[in-house]
């Protein structure tokens, strides 16, 4: 201890070294051991002398001197008296800094409950004592007595008595016959009387006996807290305080303002209240005041202490003089302004500045322009030291003067200092790691920072007044990291998807597009040129045009690396572009011998990077930027009013659509269609019309016109801008020259009347008014979106922050299967794009020859992917973060390629944070609205399956019938069509919908692109399996069925209506039956009668007495009604998936494979059970609300995981029924869907990393012989450790299932309480951690930032690994010594110790 105290005064001593931090409840003895003295008076400082009052809140005797090495009365001054205590004022002569470290205490006259343990839910005191919070408060706030010892009276233990009852009982039983107390003393006695070991045994026994689920949960909660107290060494009575610690005075300062007033920290006010009330209570006790007065004073003391610890948690908030709530100790930690987030996780730093940015087109990619004034200020200390070294100044003062006068030699020295000293530029908001990059500064005049145009997209910067901050890395290590890791030239690829991020945009794209245009009939067409000089000469002489078709002799490089010449047909502009390409055999002229749009340019940069490396790419990018800017300026592209071409056929389309809309209106008025249908149809018609007009306009704009000479005319400027990807989109062009189209209301509904005019024609007043509606919502949305997206990113970072690459290989054989994603016949994501940069679990083989294409454990590069795709491999099983078996972090093999570098991932890479940033950063581009689907949006519903391969058709679970029309119809739900190669390899499998019309049969040969089956996506059929005549049951006109005549077609259709509401209809069970010749209901082959139950809204397709064949449709249920549901899209959907929330109308999923049986209806629910195929399992039963449509019939066979009721599946159900792999596939696909819609590319592995973090907990199903409690959620690591221990001791291990936690919940339940407390719900997290005596092993990033260390990632990880190796080696040596020591006694003479050599 003395050493520590001595270290306090030596500012150079290293900080205490520690590996972990433990938090627990402080006992009164502990608080006293921290304290340097008791505070007895509420006074702070004397207002005349400004000296602290003795024994007050700022007392110098307790907390230390105010001035360094000077006692209060001034008797002892200076260093020589260090450590002496002045006999006059009792102040120790030492540094005033101790006033930040020394604590005091207040001895309370009556015990007080700690509000965190009382009120923070669940109440810890309440759980331990098994009392409700209400009762506890009644005792604590002196309303009721509690019986501690009933003695021989009729009172019960822990019975509550009001004042009157207490007095009555005393009269009745006599004063000493029982003990009852009131207030915190009573609770303290109760807590002290708990025998935890006994209590634990009782609770475990009760849990074994109880059958009620609720009771079991309650007991488990209590048991958990009892165990926590037993194992942590905390005593329950410590939750009641007798001593309050007082924090050091310099952490709650009192600052004199001018005018004799003081500014003070709120804590001083709160402490003052506590001291005042405490002193008053002491005095009242000495005076033997009446009980009621003392009791009131005790209650007030309790309230004062409550307010000090957590103001406003109970009762009303205590406010200061200006009606502002006082900030208590808890508020100091909580929220964005609290200690954690404001000071520990984010700090303001020196050596930084900020200024407006302007474009710097003449900079190189690794440079930024730094204003001289800023540089001078930022590098001041460096300049001083250099001035001193050169002998230009002898003192700092002198150097300061030189710099202030800005002498010429200072500028020379600044140049020297800045050379090769990178600076960091940061643009807020820093949404991903590319928001901070390092550049070499170039000194410039002026006051604005110059930024290279190509890095703008990484910073998301533009030059409309954006500001950026500059930071100077000081130490050599920091400079090294800035240069090697953060230099803009080292960040060419986007960490989210591995695409180049240094991509030209806007003017540069337009210039490059213009250069690469080829036009027919330009001057000099067909001329040939041998080299660049000839070409430039001809261009200057205007003999040829930039766009003329010419022949050119191109010097490329062949595979051997030698120069190879060949003739190519191209244009002069493209040759200029081609000359910038680096020479490489793989990068040919064909790469740029086409029209360069933004996408093409990105592709070229990608190719150059993959083949020629980083340095060449950077040089190439700088060059094409210069070329692009120059040509954009030379081309002089601008646009006028006539460039917006209104298509000729516009009004014709508008008129037809108008008549259509009128027809729909008329049909609605005649009652043929509902309002909803009319709305959908009208909206549909108008959106089709505006699409058509847009097509027409694009056609007219994009066609190249001819001039009088027969040459191609200039391309339309607007089309050039949009087509090149420089600015504007077809949607914007449509509004300029087509028609503006439909507008949305703020609710997201679409207004039926469209805006027919475009901006060129101008809008009418009504149209303008309609359009303001949606536009205003758009702006409001953007503001909300930014906040929501930021919050999502914060939650993601928090859940994944401790996910780091820690080892090379975890050696697992598990993985997840990847296949191409196909939607409605179009390829959404190819297999290659999904497995690039991943590691296969097993050898990837050619399906035709069975040759190994990629060995297991190889990182798949582009070359491997080409081979895999050519061989036509359908599915590859790859290693994934989800299946990685490491305890801490993820291994290199399971992660694969580091997307930002294109190489295998490095040790210590913080992949969790990268994943969080990659998912969160595009969040601002996602939409916020929920789409109301109806009309146009459902036309892309998939309604057929076609084959992507040639081969033979094999049908599993076959059940096909030929219906009356002679078509083949699929009769079961689990039929699978497989396409097989001639040599028997499966190439593709398709699940066929029930009621589909089959185009192929078992054993047919099929061609690529041929349809296998098709179905009507808008209805669900009910098919007959038997041949016979139709009979109706319980189908009574007006009661359970109603007939409507469709006037437009003249056909009557009969619809089943809700029969339950009608009189006498409650017991009806409407159905269609198939009767045989004898008029009896037929029996089906699979068991049961040929009776088909009908649900509400089913439309009948047959009449009584009609004959039907198997496969004929008896009735259909329109899914149209289900389709116009709101689909949550954009950000809310992503958040919903990551939070693992249960969707509103969740699907019901079959938990086992089996046969459907309809049971007896239960109230207003239908009962369905599944008879399992596997007889060892028990049947499952589901209750389904009657309004929901069940598309299954009695006797249908379902597979495990099939939907019984349609809807969005709840992720928890998928995990429970189908397992982790299916869940991962579902989450990845659903999240990717949202991002794909916005055109954002994110690699699957990022989502997998987050999902891994969501699956860290296991729910114990059977505790075995371990200490775990059934139903509790345990960390995977803890679960495995406890099980391993149990197995070692020969006990029965526990079993459990993985649980899926939402990201917020997962963050709050991490192993590190520091990380959780700094995230959300700080008080709750800290309370729980303290009760459990939790230890934070400081493994993640956040915890280490909080305690002020290097993070264990990146360069900080290597230090951690070195330490680990050293510890292992030490352990080996110690073990060896112990072994030797054990052997020694049995031998006669002592042997020298043999030590292994140090590594």
From Swiss-Prot:
- Which SUPFAM superfamilies does the record associate with it? beta and beta-prime subunits of DNA dependent RNA-polymerase
* Keyword Lipid biosynthesis applies: no
Residues annotated as binding Zn(2+) 2 are 810, 884, 891, 894
Annotated keywords? DNA-directed RNA polymerase, Magnesium, Metal-binding, Nucleotidyltransferase, Transcription, Transferase, Zinc
EC class name? transferase
The GO biological-process annotations, alphabetized, read as: DNA-templated transcription
Catalytic reaction annotation:
RNA(n) + a ribonucleoside 5'-triphosphate = RNA(n+1) + diphosphate
EC id: 2.7.7.6
Q: Which domain of life is it from?
A: Bacteria
* Keyword presence, Iron-sulfur: no
Which InterPro entries does UniProt cross-reference here?
DNA-dir_RpoC_beta_prime, DNA-dir_RpoC_beta_prime_bact, RNA_pol_asu, RNA_pol_N, RNA_pol_Rpb1_1, RNA_pol_Rpb1_3, RNA_pol_Rpb1_3_sf, RNA_pol_Rpb1_4
Q: Which cofactor does it need?
A: Mg(2+); Zn(2+)
In the UniProt record, which is one GO cellular component term? Answer: DNA-directed RNA polymerase complex
Q: What Pfam families does the database record attribute to this sequence?
A: RNA_pol_Rpb1_1, RNA_pol_Rpb1_2, RNA_pol_Rpb1_3, RNA_pol_Rpb1_4, RNA_pol_Rpb1_5
Q: What does this protein do?
A: DNA-dependent RNA polymerase catalyzes the transcription of DNA into RNA using the four ribonucleoside triphosphates as substrates.
Q: Which NCBIfam families match?
A: rpoC_TIGR
Subunit description: The RNAP catalytic core consists of 2 alpha, 1 beta, 1 beta' and 1 omega subunit. When a sigma factor is associated with the core the holoenzyme is formed, which can initiate transcription.
Family according to the record:
Belongs to the RNA polymerase beta' chain family.
PANTHER family membership: DNA-DIRECTED RNA POLYMERASE (PTHR19376), DNA-DIRECTED RNA POLYMERASE SUBUNIT BETA (PTHR19376:SF54)
Q: What is this protein called?
A: DNA-directed RNA polymerase subunit beta'
Species this chain originates from: Bradyrhizobium sp. (strain ORS 278)
């Amino acid at each position: 201890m003395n050493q520590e105290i001595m270290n306090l005064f030596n500012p150079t001593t290293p900080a205490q070294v520690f590996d972990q931090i433990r938090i627990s409840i402080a006992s009164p003895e502990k608080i006293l051991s921290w304290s340097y003295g008791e505070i007895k008076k509420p006074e702070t400082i004397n207002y005349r002398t400004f000296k602290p009052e003795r024994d007050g809140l700022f007392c110098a005797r307790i907390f230390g001197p105010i001035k360094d090495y000077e006692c209060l009365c001034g008797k002892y001054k200076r260093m020589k008296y260090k450590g002496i205590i002045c006999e006059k004022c009792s102040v120790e002569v030492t540094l005033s800094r101790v006033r930040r470290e020394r604590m005091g205490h207040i001895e309370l006259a009556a015990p007080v409950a700690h509000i965190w343990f009382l009120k923070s839910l669940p109440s810890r005191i309440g759980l331990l004592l098994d009392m409700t919070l209400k009762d506890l408060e009644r005792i604590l706030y002196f309303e009721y007595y509690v019986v501690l010892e009933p003695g021989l009276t009729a009172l019960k233990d822990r019975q509550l008595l009001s004042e009157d009852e207490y007095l009555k009982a005393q009269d009745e039983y006599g004063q000493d016959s029982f003990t009852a107390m009131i207030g915190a003393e009573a609770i303290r006695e109760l807590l002290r009387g708990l025998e935890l070991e006994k209590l634990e045994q009782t609770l475990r026994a009760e849990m074994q006996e109880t059958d009620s689920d609720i009771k079991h949960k309650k007991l488990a909660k209590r048991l958990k807290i009892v165990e926590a107290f037993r194992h942590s060494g905390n005593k329950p009575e410590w939750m009641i305080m007798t001593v309050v610690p007082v924090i050091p005075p310099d952490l709650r300062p009192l600052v004199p303002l001018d005018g004799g007033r003081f500014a003070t920290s709120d804590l001083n006010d709160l402490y003052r209240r506590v001291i005042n009330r405490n002193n008053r209570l002491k005095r009242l006790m000495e005076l033997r005041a009446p009980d009621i007065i003392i009791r009131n004073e005790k209650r007030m003391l309790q309230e004062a202490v409550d307010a000090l610890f957590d103001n406003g948690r109970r009762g009303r908030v205590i406010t200061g003089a200006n009606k502002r709530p006082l900030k208590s100790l808890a508020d100091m930690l909580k929220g964005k302004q609290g200690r954690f987030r404001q000071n520990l996780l984010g700090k303001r730093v020196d050596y930084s500045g900020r200024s407006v940015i302007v474009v710097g087109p003449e900079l190189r990619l690794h440079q930024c322009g730094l204003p001289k004034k800023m540089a001078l200020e930022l590098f001041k200390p460096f300049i001083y030291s250099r001035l001193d070294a050169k002998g230009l100044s002898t003192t700092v003062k002198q150097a300061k003067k030189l710099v202030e006068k800005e002498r010429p030699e200072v500028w020379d020295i600044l140049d020297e200092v800045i050379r090769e000293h990178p600076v960091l530029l940061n643009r807020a908001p820093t949404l991903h790691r590319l928001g901070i990059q390092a550049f070499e500064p170039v000194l410039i005049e002026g006051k604005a920072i110059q930024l290279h145009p190509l890095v703008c997209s990484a910073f998301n910067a533009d030059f409309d007044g954006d500001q950026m901050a500059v930071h100077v890395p000081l130490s050599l290590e920091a400079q090294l990291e800035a240069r090697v890791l953060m230099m803009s030239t080292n960040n060419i690829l986007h960490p989210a998807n591995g695409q180049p991020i240094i991509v030209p945009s806007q003017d540069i794209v337009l210039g490059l597009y213009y250069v690469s245009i080829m036009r027919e009939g330009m001057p000099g067409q067909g001329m040939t040129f041998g080299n660049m000089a000839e070409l430039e000469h001809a261009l200057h002489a205007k003999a040829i045009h930039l766009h003329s078709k010419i022949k050119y002799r191109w010097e490329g490089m062949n595979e051997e690396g030698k120069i190879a010449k060949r003739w190519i047909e191209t244009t002069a502009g493209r040759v200029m572009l081609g000359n910038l390409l680096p020479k490489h055999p793989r990068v040919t002229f064909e790469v740029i011998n086409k029209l360069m749009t933004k996408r093409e340019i990105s592709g070229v940069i990608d190719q150059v990077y993959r083949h020629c490396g980083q340095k060449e790419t950077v040089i190439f990018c700088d060059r094409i930027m210069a070329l692009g800017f120059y040509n954009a300026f030379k081309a002089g592209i601008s646009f006028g009013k006539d460039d917006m071409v209104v298509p000729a056929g516009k009004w014709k389309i508008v008129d037809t659509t108008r008549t259509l809309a009128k027809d729909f209106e008329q049909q609605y008025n005649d009652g043929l269609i509902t309002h909803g249908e009319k709305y959908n149809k009208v909206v549909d018609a108008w959106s089709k019309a505006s699409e058509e007009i847009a097509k027409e306009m694009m056609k007219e704009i994009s066609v190249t016109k001819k001039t009088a000479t027969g040459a191609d005319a200039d391309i339309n400027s607007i089309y050039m801008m949009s087509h090149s990807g420089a600015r504007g989109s077809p949607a914007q062009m449509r509004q300029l020259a087509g028609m503006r189209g439909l507008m949305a209301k703020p609710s997201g509904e679409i207004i039926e009347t469209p805006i027919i005019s475009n901006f060129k024609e101008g809008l009418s007043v009504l149209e303008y008014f309609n359009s303001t509606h949606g536009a205003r919502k758009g702006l409001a949305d953007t503001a909300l979106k930014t906040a929501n997206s930021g919050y999502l990113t914060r939650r993601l970072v928090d859940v994944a922050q401790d996910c780091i690459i820690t080892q090379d290989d975890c050696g697992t054989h598990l993985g997840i299967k990847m296949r191409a994603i196909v939607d409605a016949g179009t390829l959404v994501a190819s297999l290659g794009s999904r497995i690039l940069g991943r590691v296969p679990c097993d050898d990837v083989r050619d399906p035709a020859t069975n040759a190994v294409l990629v060995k297991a454990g190889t990182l798949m590069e582009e070359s491997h992917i080409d081979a895999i795709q050519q061989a036509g491999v359908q599915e590859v099983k790859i290693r994934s973060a989800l299946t990685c078996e490491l305890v801490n972090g993820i291994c290199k093999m399971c992660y694969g390629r580091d997307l930002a570098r294109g190489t295998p991932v490095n040790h210590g890479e913080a992949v969790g944070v990268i994943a969080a940033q990659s998912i969160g950063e595009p969040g601002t581009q996602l939409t916020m609205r929920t789409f109301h689907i109806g009309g146009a949006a459902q036309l892309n519903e998939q309604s057929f399956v076609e084959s992507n391969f040639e081969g033979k058709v094999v049908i599993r679970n076959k059940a096909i019938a030929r219906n009356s029309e002679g078509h083949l119809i699929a009769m079961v739900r689990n039929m699978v069509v497989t396409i097989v190669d001639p040599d028997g390899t499966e190439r593709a499998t398709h699940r066929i919908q029930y009621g589909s019309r089959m185009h192929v049969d078992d054993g047919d040969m099929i061609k690529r692109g041929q349809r296998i089956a098709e179905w009507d996506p808008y209805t669900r059929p009910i098919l007959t399996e038997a041949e016979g005549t139709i009979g109706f049951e319980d189908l009574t006109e007006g009661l359970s069925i109603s007939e409507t005549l469709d006037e437009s077609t003249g056909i009557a259709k009969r619809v089943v209506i809700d029969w339950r509401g009608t009189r006498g209809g409650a017991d009806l069970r409407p159905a269609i039956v198939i009767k045989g010749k004898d008029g009896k209901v037929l029996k089906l082959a699979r068991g049961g009668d040929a009776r088909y139950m009908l649900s509400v809204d089913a439309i009948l397709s047959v009449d009584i007495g009609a004959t039907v064949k198997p496969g004929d449709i008896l009735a259909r249920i329109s899914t149209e009604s289900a389709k116009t549901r709101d689909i949550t899209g954009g950000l809310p959907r992503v958040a919903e998936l990551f939070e693992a929330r249960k969707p509103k109308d969740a699907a019901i999923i079959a938990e086992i494979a089996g046969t459907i049986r309809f049971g007896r209806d239960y109230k207003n629910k239908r009962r369905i059970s599944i008879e399992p195929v596997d007889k060892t399992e028990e049947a499952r039963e589901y209750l389904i609300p009657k309004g929901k449509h069940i598309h299954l019939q009695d006797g249908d066979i379902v597979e495990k995981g099939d939907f019984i009721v349609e809807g969005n599946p709840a992720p928890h159900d998928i995990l429970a029924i189908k397992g982790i792999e299916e869940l991962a596939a579902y989450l990845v696909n659903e999240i990717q869907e949202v991002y794909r819609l916005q055109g954002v590319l994110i690699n699957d592995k990022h989502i997998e990393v987050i999902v891994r973090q969501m699956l860290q907990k296991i729910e114990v199903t059977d505790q075995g012989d371990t200490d775990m409690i059934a139903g509790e959620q345990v960390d995977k690591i803890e679960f495995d450790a406890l099980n391993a221990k149990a197995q070692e001791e020969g006990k029965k291990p526990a079993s459990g299932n993985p649980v899926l936690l939402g990201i917020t919940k997962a963050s709050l339940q991490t192993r590190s309480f520091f990380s959780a407390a700094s995230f959300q719900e700080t008080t709750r997290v800290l309370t729980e951690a303290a009760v459990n005596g939790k230890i934070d092993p400081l493994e993640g990033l956040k915890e280490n930032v909080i305690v002020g260390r290097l993070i264990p990632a990146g360069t900080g990880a290597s230090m951690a690994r070195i330490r680990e190796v050293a510890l292992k080696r030490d352990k080996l040596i110690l073990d060896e010594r112990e072994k030797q020591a054990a052997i020694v006694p049995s031998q006669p003479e002592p042997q020298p110790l043999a030590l292994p050599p140090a590594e």
